[in-house]
Regions:
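Hinge/cleft segment of the Venus flytrap/periplasmic-binding protein
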Residues: 99-100, 189-235
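Flexible loop/hinge segments that line or gate small-molecule binding clefts
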Residues: 20-60, 77, 86, 168-183, ...
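Loop/turn elements at helix/coil->beta-strand transitions in domains of secreted/extracellular proteins
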Residues: 8-12, 32-37, 50, 74-77, ...
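Hydrophobic alpha-helical segments within soluble ligand-binding/sensing domains
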Residues: 54-78, 90-91, 118-125, 170-173, ...
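Secondary-structure junction motif
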Residues: 81-82, 86-94
Length: 235
C-alpha cells in the first residue's frame, strides 16, 4: 500500500507500522521519491529514516502500570501479552519489566505474542488456563489484548483474583475499571498525537523547523481517578 501511495505521487504519509523493521524498504523508497514520512503511535527501527515521530511515552506507560501494581499487591506471578515487532510494545514491556524487577516478590512467568489483536489474545489466554499456568497478574501492551484476556478469564470463571492491566485508556477498558473488573490502564491521548503530527507536517510544508521526535505524556487510570474520565470516548 505504501508503494502504491508513493507511485500515485503523494507528498507525505502518516505511518503506524505493524512491524518496525519490515517497513524499512518501503520507507527508504519513499525517501528516494522525496515523500515526507511521519510516524505516529509507534516508531521505525531506524529512526533516521523518519522525518518526524510522534508517539506516547511508551516506556513510562509500562512504568506507571508496574508502579500501580506494586502499590496494590505484595507479590505476584505475571503473564505479559506483547507485540514484539512494534517499538511501542517493546518500550511498554521494558518499562514494566524494569520496574517490576526492582521488587523480588514478583515473577514474570510467561510472555505471549498476540500481535496486538483481541482475537489472538483470547485463545492464547485460554491455552495458558488449560495448561494450568499459575499466575495472578496479566499485563497487556494494549487494552484490546486486556479485553481478550478478560473475556477468556470470564469464560473460565477466573476473573476474580486476577489483576489485569493494559495501555490505551480505551472506552471499554475504562468501563471495566469502573466496574472493578480491570485494575488499571495507562492512558494515551490519540487526539494530541494526531494534532502534533499534523502540526509538524504543516511545519514541513511551510519550511519551518520540525521537531524530529515528540513524546506525548501518558496518565494512569485506576479506580482512584476513573470518575475523572468519560467511558464514552477517548481522552
Amino acid at each position: 500500500q505504501i508503494y502504491d501511495l508513493i507511485d500515485e505521487g503523494v507528498e507525505a504519509i502518516f505511518i503506524a507500522p505493524v512491524d518496525f523493521e519490515k517497513i524499512i524498504p518501503a520507507v527508504e523508497y519513499g525517501r528516494e521519491k522525496g515523500v515526507e514520512m511521519i510516524f505516529v503511535d509507534t516508531e521505525i527501527y531506524d529512526e533516521s529514516l523518519a522525518d518526524c515521530i510522534v508517539v506516547s511515552d511508551n516506556y513510562h506507560a509500562g512504568v506507571l502500570c508496574a508502579e500501580y501494581l506494586l502499590s496494590k499487591k505484595a507479590e505476584g506471578k505475571i503473564l505479559i501479552f506483547e507485540h514484539p515487532t512494534t517499538k511501542s510494545s517493546n518500550d511498554r514491556v521494558e518499562g514494566f519489566a524494569d520496574t517490576i524487577e526492582e521488587n523480588g516478590n514478583f515473577e514474570i512467568v510467561g510472555r505471549m505474542d498476540y500481535a496486538g489483536q483481541l482475537e489472538i489474545a483470547m485463545p492464547l489466554m485460554i491455552d495458558e488456563l488449560k495448561k494450568g499456568v499459575e499466575f495472578d497478574v496479566v499485563f497487556s501492551i494494549n487494552d484490546v489484548g486486556a479485553l481478550g484476556v478478560m473475556a477468556a478469564l470470564k469464560d473460565y470463571g477466573r476473573l476474580d483474583g486476577i489483576s489485569v492491566l493494559g495501555v490505551d485508556g480505551a472506552p471499554e477498558a475504562k468501563s471495566m475499571i469502573k466496574e472493578k473488573i480491570m485494575l488499571a490502564t495507562s492512558a494515551q491521548y490519540p487526539s494530541e498525537i494526531g494534532q502534533n503530527a499534523v502540526d509538524q507536517l504543516y511545519n514541513m510544508i511551510e519550511g519551518r523547523p520540525v521537531e524530529k521526535k515528540i513524546k506525548v505524556s501518558v496518565n494512569l487510570i485506576s479506580e482512584e481517578n476513573i470518575n475523572e474520565f468519560s467511558t464514552k470516548g477517548w481522552q
